[in-house]
């Protein structure tokens, strides 16, 4: 169980250390054989090496089985050229590992429905996983360009691109509530027709998982009106970009949202939130997203589904018992982590 740890910038080192405490506790209790090494990344790497994704970090990622990432960026590096910015390091990391599927869970924890912008009765029971295709679609399609008179982009997907992200979604659904909603715009776009047909073909290999199709406009409406009906959503790059951001507001705080990026190389697990330089070093950062990212790592990189659920349950109890400041409580990073560890014991 070899992990490359990239704490990054701002609150990244603090929340990553909280996640590592949880992993170390599990390793001690379960004998996981955890081995990890810390590498500079983002702004911290720029300060040390002059680039955000330096060769020692790149090598560490290549040799690891999973990457646990904190956060990158901050005002200190805002004026740098784009090609050496902390955010470019993140894009380079994903590209180097051919990470084609982004997984973004959005869960409203029991007892915290009041945090959601939705009515409590609508928010109750929400637990949705958005699986977004990361490397194809209109963001990368050619030709693309712009003139004085017009601009153009190309929405393009190959069959293997759709098949592989669909498999990720169906495999995830098998470990959850066994229901996949595939989102497209098949009524007006040929790419949507192709997407739908290909997902259906993949779905035949998963007879235990129910498959439903929705147009993207209907899916957006249902995510707001009745989000608890969703289990796993799979969609293309641009629709996934929009729907995952829409779903991210359902729990009520970015501090609750983990993510995973999966592909051919080393998978990356990271909080959705940014580096929050305004609270860095104050000991008040909410480590929930980082701890849940570690739980996703246990599940998706190492197949330890039961341990991942154990971590999620401990976090849910800690959120009710000692909520952090961004959720209306007063528990600092260390105090909240201690509560999680107590419930894991």
Swiss-Prot record:
Keywords: Amino-acid biosynthesis, Branched-chain amino acid biosynthesis, Cytoplasm, Leucine biosynthesis, Magnesium, Manganese, Metal-binding, NAD, Oxidoreductase. It comes from the Bacteria. One of its GO terms (biological process) is L-leucine biosynthetic process. NAD(+) binds at residues 74-87, 274-286. Its cofactor is Mg(2+); Mn(2+). Pathway: Amino-acid biosynthesis; L-leucine biosynthesis; L-leucine from 3-methyl-2-oxobutanoate: step 3/4. The record marks 139, 185 as: Important for catalysis. Substrate binds at residues 94, 104, 132, 217. One of its GO terms (cellular component) is cytosol. The keyword Amino-acid biosynthesis applies. Its EC number is 1.1.1.85. It is found in: Cytoplasm. Transmembrane segments: none annotated. Mg(2+) binds at residues 217, 241, 245. Catalyzes the oxidation of 3-carboxy-2-hydroxy-4-methylpentanoate (3-isopropylmalate) to 3-carboxy-4-methyl-2-oxopentanoate. The product decarboxylates to 4-methyl-2 oxopentanoate. Belongs to the isocitrate and isopropylmalate dehydrogenases family. LeuB type 1 subfamily. Homodimer. PANTHER family: 3-ISOPROPYLMALATE DEHYDROGENASE. This is 3-isopropylmalate dehydrogenase. The gene is leuB.
């Amino acid at each position: 169980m070899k992990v490359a740890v990239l704490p990054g910038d701002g609150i990244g080192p603090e929340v990553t250390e909280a996640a590592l405490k949880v992993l170390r506790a599990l390793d001690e209790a379960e004998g996981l054989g955890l081995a990890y090494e810390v590498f500079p990344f983002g702004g911290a790497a720029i300060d040390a090496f002059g680039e955000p994704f330096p060769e020692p970090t790149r090598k560490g990622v290549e040799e690891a089985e999973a990457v646990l990432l904190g956060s990158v960026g901050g005002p200190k590096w805002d004026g740098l050229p784009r090609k050496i910015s902390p955010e470019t390091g993140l894009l380079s990391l994903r590209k180097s590992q051919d990470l084609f599927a982004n997984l973004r869970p959005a869960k409203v924890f029991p007892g915290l429905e009041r945090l959601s912008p939705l009515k409590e009765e609508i928010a109750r029971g929400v637990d949705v996983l958005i699986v977004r295709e990361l490397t194809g679609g209109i963001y990368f399609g050619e030709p693309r360009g712009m003139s004085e008179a017009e601009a153009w982009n190309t929405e393009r997907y190959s069959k293997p691109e759709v098949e592989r992200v669909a498999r990720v979604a169906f495999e995830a659904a098998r470990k959850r509530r066994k229901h996949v909603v595939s989102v497209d715009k098949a009524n007006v776009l040929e790419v949507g027709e192709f997407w739908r047909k290909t997902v259906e073909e993949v779905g035949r290999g998963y007879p235990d998982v129910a498959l439903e199709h929705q147009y993207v406009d209907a899916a957006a409406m249902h995510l707001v009106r009745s989000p608890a009906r969703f289990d796993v959503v799979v969609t293309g790059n641009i629709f996934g970009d929009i729907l995952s951001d829409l779903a991210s507001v359902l729990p009520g705080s970015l501090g609750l949202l983990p993510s995973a990026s999966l592909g051919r190389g080393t998978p990356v697990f990271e909080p959705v939130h940014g580096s929050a330089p305004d609270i860095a070093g104050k000991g008040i950062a909410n480590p929930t997203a980082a701890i849940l990212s570690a739980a996703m790592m246990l599940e998706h990189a190492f197949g330890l589904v039961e341990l991942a659920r154990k971590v999620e349950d401990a976090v849910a109890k800690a959120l009710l018992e000692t909520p952090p400041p961004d959720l209306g409580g007063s528990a600092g990073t260390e105090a909240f982590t201690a509560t999680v560890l107590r419930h894991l014991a």
